[in-house]
Amino acid sequence: MTTTSPLNDERAVSRLRVDDDIVLASMPLRDGTDRAALSRFGDDVWDMAPAMFNMARKAFRTVDFGVIPCAAERLLAKEYIYAWMNERRADGEPRLRPVSGHTALATLRRFLDFVRSRIGKLDLANVDQDLIDAYATHHRARPITPGRVGVCLRPIVQLHRLAPYLTCGGITFTPWRGRPVYRATGQGTRCSENRTARIPEPVIGAMLRWALKYVEHLCDDIF
């Protein structure tokens, strides 16, 4: 059974990774990528760009762990992002995309800060259902969509799911008894109803007629 230990600098050495582990080990890479130049687990800034095939904002091309002053928390964050990107679990959950690493770190840190503010220290062993319910309530009270609330709660589920790959042991109980995150947001369904007003039929009809006319009579020059 995985045990959870308080996060302190004595726990800042990974039981599972070595500094030379390649961060993008399981990711498809762009043609011409020099594998010798890829970011390693021991680096405090991970370059995700070699595994990005579409344009992304500069901020999302790297994951910067150097902003975390506590060495043990920095290790937890590294193991969390590394495991989510590279480890395949039997539950079939998709792995973290490199372009999402920046956001995943931000949402993790937000939850860890909440834990510290509630119990006075960062100790995942003291995280219980009441605490994560309070965290969900905190985000539901914000002026954000239910989908965004779900994103904010995702670290809770992942800290449990990835516990075997975390030196500190992660969250040992099953959050919300295994219910999907979107139900914990109070949303009730996976997708909320689209409340955008329908385009009036006379308008959409005219648009379709012009589209068909263009395809049938006016677009020879593009074929």
Question: Where do the protein language model's features map onto the residues?
Answer:
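Extended, charge-enriched helical/coil interaction regions that scaffold DNA-processing
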Residues: 1-223
